[in-house]
A protein has these predicted regions:
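Class I SAM-dependent methyltransferase SAM/SAH-binding core
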Residues: 46-48, 52-100
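Helix-to-beta-strand junctions that scaffold the AdoMet/dcAdoMet cofactor pocket
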Residues: 64, 120-121, 134-135
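A short acidic, Gly/Pro-enriched loop at the edge of an enzyme's catalytic core
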Residues: 99-110
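A short SAM/SAH-binding and catalytic strip from SAM-dependent methyltransferases
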Residues: 110-122
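Conserved beta-strand signature within the Rossmann-like core of class I S-adenosyl-L-methionine
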Residues: 138-144
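Short alpha-helix
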Residues: 162-177
Length: 199
């Protein structure tokens, strides 16, 4: 992948306005994944690569009014779609690169990242940045509302062991970035890897 995010912006910007209508049935899967992140009232959580902010209402529900929810995305058009959908009421929206976040070290209890890892130009560096902003013992959810095989089929590809989300690749990638993989689910209707911040 390129070192910049032009390819990500070029892909998502023209699709932002109708992104939610293209995948209208994903909402419950987001809510279930957020539920498995183990958030508590008052926690601080980041939705990294938040897109149109589909996870923000569930994240706000989990941390309550005393918690902090931040949604960061590198594509302005996706954040604009989140605003049109009224999701800024669930969290603060920030135009930011997930690999260079405008957050202090160790300020988050958890990070939620739906579909993000395959869009990071340097995945270990990007996951390391997510670890930097998470406290020791903080949690990470790498999520997609469909599993690897279904996603590969959607894009006209065959499933490959080279996929970053394949467990044999993901486990050492996370470890090198400061995370320990705790659970891994790759099913037809979802992908969810949960990790804990080490150190």
């Amino acid at each position: 992948m390129a070192d910049d995010h032009t390819h990500v912006q070029d892909f998502f910007a023209p699709r932002a306005a109708d992104w939610d209508s293209r995948f209208p049935d994903d909402g419950p899967a987001f809510a279930v994944a957020v539920g498995e992140l183990g958030l508590s009232p008052g926690d601080a959580v980041l939705d990294a690569g938040c897109g149109t902010g589909r996870a923000l209402p569930a994240l706000r529900g989990a941390v309550g009014p005393g918690g902090t929810v931040v949604g960061a995305d590198v594509t302005h058009a996706m954040l604009a779609a989140a605003l049109r959908a009224g999701r800024e009421s669930s969290g603060t929206l920030v135009l930011a690169d997930a690999a260079r976040l405008p957050l202090r070290a160790g300020v988050l209890d958890a990070v939620f990242a739906a579909g993000l890892i395959s869009h990071l130009p340097h995945p270990e560096q990007g996951l390391g940045e997510l670890a930097r902003v998470a406290r020791p013992g903080g949690r990470l959810a790498l999520f997609h509302p469909i599993g690897r095989a279904a996603l590969a089929a959607r894009h006209g590809r065959t499933l490959s062991d080279d996929d970053l989300r394949a467990e044999p690749r993901l486990t050492p990638l996370l470890a090198g970035a400061g995370w320990r993989l705790e659970s891994y689910a790759d099913e037809d209707r979802r992908f969810l890897a949960l990790a804990v911040r080490t150190g």
